[in-house]
Each structure stands twice: as C-alpha cells, then as structure tokens.
Amino acid sequence: MALVVKGKVNINEFIDLSKSEKLLPSMFTPVKSVMVSKVDKIMVHENESLSEVNLLKGVKLIEGGYVCLVGLVVSGEWNLPDNCRGGVSVCMVDKRMERADEATLGSYYTAAAKKRFQFKVVPNYGITTKDAEKNIWQVLVNIKNVKMSAGYCPLSLEFVSVCIVYKNNIKLGLREKVTSVNDGGPMELSEEVVDEFMENVPMSVRLAKFRTKSSKRGPKNNNNLGKGRSGGRPKPKSFDEVEKEFDNLIEDEAETSVADSDSY
C-alpha cells in the first residue's frame, strides 16, 4: 500500500507570515524564500536502523548562503494486516552533533494497529549551504514486537520539510515567526497508550546506544544501519520490561492526511 497524497503542506502551520511579507518583494522583508521540499522515502526493513534522509530534496540552495529548516512533516504507513501488535519509535537526528541528547530533534511513538500516522517537528534552526549539501539529517527507527520474517518491509516513511533559503544572516530573527516552537528541548510526541510504556526510554538514550554499538562494529554505510529482524543480540535489561508491555498494545485505526510532494 502506497501512502495517499492529500493536499499541500500548509506553510502557515509553521511560519506566521504577515500580509506585507506575502506581497512585498523579498528585498523588503526578512523572509527571503520559503520552500517546500519534495518527498523523500524510506522503506524500513530492520528492527533498529539509522538511515540518512534528504530533508532538502528538490530545494534550490544558494551558494555561500544558508538554509533554515523551519519544520517537517513525517508520514508513515504500516504494511501489515489489521490489529497487529507491536509498534515503533521514530526519531529525527542531526548527525553533526556528538551528544545524543543534542542530536535528537524530535521523536514520535505509535502502535502498529494505528496503520497510518503523521507527526510534525519544528527544528527551526539554520545551517550553511555547505553543511546542507552533506545531507546531515538521519532518522532513527526502533520497531518493537512486530513479528515479521526477515527480508520484508513492515513500515514505510515519507518526509517533507518547510525551509527558508537566504544569502545573508537575517537581521530580524525568525524564531518569533515560527509557530508551535518548543524551547524546552527536543519534542517527544506519542500516542498516549504507547507513551505509557515507552516514556522511560528517551530516544536520546536509544541513539547513544545505537551509535556506540555501530562504532564497535567499525565504519559502515549510514543508510539502513542496524540489527536485522532475525538478529539474536540480547536486549539491555531496561528495554525488556518495555517489550513485554508493548507486546499487548492495540490501538484504534485512525486516518491521517499525508504531505504533498510539490515544491515551490
């Protein structure tokens, strides 16, 4: 089943632009060029994986300039029969940051019975064009108690971002223009019933463990790193209790709209 595309990404959900900023030429406003990326897709085949994701796909960057990742929409669909047990945690990562708690931009937990889900993250920070060309963002996926044979794809994810491209540092800051910004740190969103069992294992802890485990194995391709679905490596004790509880989760199926892939 492919994700169903419905409508466009609403820029106003991320940036509160005034009427003058919408009408005036860019030279007269602090906001220069607001763009929506094309869709980037990841097919998840592993129980645990850290994969690169292109959040600026189709975005025209300015040489020697900057790009501000204002917000992104992540849509997912389980490729499973109805009412399957288990679930997933999804975390957006900035791979430049060495401290795991600073590298996590936002995370989301949901059960497999949900079938389709969507969440938004508001990173709201700028990077140089040179850094952006190195594809610095990743997604950490941790699937629990989904019993599927190795070699198949239980979950599909799609990513669309809203960003601002500019040549020089904007004199008037953008933070006051961005809606729903959480200044307390990385956002962790969840379905309530999943959060009951998962909140004691923050995604920053999972990221730190994954990075340590990967470094011991030696350098590998960053795309789809992680343990295979048939791997038998024992879990850390702190995860065992979560696994037992998580196995009994069943949530009502809910529909959600999916971000459009157009860029402009």
UniProtKB/Swiss-Prot annotation:
Belongs to the tobamovirus movement protein family. Keywords: Host cell junction, Host cytoplasm, Host cytoskeleton, Hypersensitive response elicitation, RNA-binding, Transport, Viral movement protein. GO terms for cellular component: host cell cytoplasm; host cell plasmodesma; host cytoskeleton; viral replication complex. Residues 237-247 have a biased composition (Basic and acidic residues). Transports viral genome to neighboring plant cells directly through plasmosdesmata, without any budding. The movement protein allows efficient cell to cell propagation, by bypassing the host cell wall barrier. Forms a ribonucleoprotein complex with viral RNA. Triggers host hypersensitive defense reaction in incompatible tomato plants harboring Tm-2, Tm-2nv or Tm-2(2) ToMV resistance (R) proteins. This is Movement protein. Changing G184E: In strain: ToMV2(2); ability to grow in tomato plants harboring the ToMV resistance protein Tm-2(2). Its main location: host cell. May bind to host RBCS at the plasmodesmata (e.g. Nicotiana benthamiana RBCS AC A0A0S4IJL0); this interaction seems required for viral systemic movement. In resistant plants, interacts with host MBP2C at host microtubules; this interaction prevents virus cell to cell movement. In resistant plants, interacts with host resistance (R) protein (e.g. tomato ToMV resistance protein TM-2(2), AC Q71BG9) at the host plasma membrane; this interaction triggers host defense responses leading to programmed cell death. Pfam families: MP. InterPro entries: TMV_movement, Viral_movement. Residues 211-264 are annotated as: Disordered. The lineage of its organism: Viruses, Riboviria, Orthornavirae, Kitrinoviricota, Alsuviricetes. GO terms for molecular function: RNA binding. It is found in: Host cytoplasm, Host cytoskeleton; Host cell junction, Host plasmodesma.
